[in-house]
Amino acid sequence: MLIQAVTIFPEMFDSITRYGVTGRANRQGIWQFEAVNPRKFADNRLGYIDDRPFGGGPGMIMMAPPLHAAIEHAKAQSSQAAKVIYLSPQGKPLTHPKAAELAELPHLILLCGRYEGIDERLLQTSVDEEISIGDFVVSGGELPAMMLMDAVLRLVPGVLGDMQSAEQDSFSSGILDCPHYTKPLEFQGMAVPEVLRSGNHGLIAEWRLEQSLRRTLERRPDLLEKRVLIPKESRLLETIRQEQREIQS
């Protein structure tokens, strides 16, 4: 997989290309990265790529021509079709299913905005999709781009040492992950649940499912409204709800 970022701050991406599981996978050649600086495509000696907005208003707007040239340069680096994504609070929310969809693609170009935004004409002519990481605003698109990259790359075969890690993550199955424990057996008076030390894999699997459902019901009940429950899940969920009703009464 080739991922390119159109950014005026290429150095920011060192954190994902050099460190952790994504950095290791990059060194192993499982995925490749290139930062494309639109300043190199500016039509002025100083590399300005922004100007004042027509109609007035605060801040500066990134100009379409240098960004368009940077995107076209990025596309030319691969013979495979690229999907151009603009990281924007106005985009559709990034979800696990969307990350899984993007993980299947061979070439992504991530457009990282700065200042007050990007000329609308560039978005209409050169961007395939706008994606948001949440209902809040940050100073630029680089951090959202790296969050998207991390979510996507975890689902690319070979990036994680064990793909089961990705399969057990929160949201991968549509519900939140269960609690996890390791040594020591006791910490500040709290012991590891006995079932996890029993060696009974069937009981452990059922406990983890029950805990995932319990946590999802408490923290993200909206996820359960979207999920088609299998009979075992329905049974466990009804038991949890009955417990809650008894506590409240």
UniProtKB/Swiss-Prot annotation:
Please provide the record's keywords in A-Z order. Cytoplasm, Methyltransferase, S-adenosyl-L-methionine, Transferase, tRNA processing
Source species taxonomy: Bacteria, Pseudomonadati, Pseudomonadota, Betaproteobacteria, Neisseriales
Q: Which PANTHER family match?
A: TRNA (GUANINE-N(1)-)-METHYLTRANSFERASE (PTHR46417:SF1)
Gene Ontology MF: a single term: tRNA (guanine(37)-N1)-methyltransferase activity
Function in brief: Specifically methylates guanosine-37 in various tRNAs.
Give the InterPro entries listed for this entry.
Answer: Alpha/beta_knot_MTases (IPR029028), tRNA_m1G_MeTrfase_C_sf (IPR023148), tRNA_m1G_MeTrfase_TrmD (IPR002649), tRNA_m1G_MTases_N (IPR029026), tRNA_MeTrfase_TRMD/TRM10 (IPR016009)
Reactions the enzyme catalyzes: guanosine(37) in tRNA + S-adenosyl-L-methionine = N(1)-methylguanosine(37) in tRNA + S-adenosyl-L-homocysteine + H(+)
**Taxonomic superkingdom:** Bacteria
Please give the name of this protein.
tRNA (guanine-N(1)-)-methyltransferase
Amino acids binding S-adenosyl-L-methionine = 113, 133-138
In the UniProt record, does the keyword Zinc-finger occur? no
HAMAP family to which the protein is assigned, alphabetical = TrmD (MF_00605)
> Where in the sequence is the signal peptide annotated?
none
The record's family statement is: Belongs to the RNA methyltransferase TrmD family.
Q: Which SUPFAM superfamilies match?
A: alpha/beta knot (SSF75217)
Q: Name one GO cellular component term.
A: cytosol
Query: What's a single GO BP term from this record?
Result: tRNA N1-guanine methylation
According to its UniProt record, the EC number is: 2.1.1.228
Quaternary structure, from the entry: Homodimer.
Q: Where does this one sit in the cell?
A: Cytoplasm
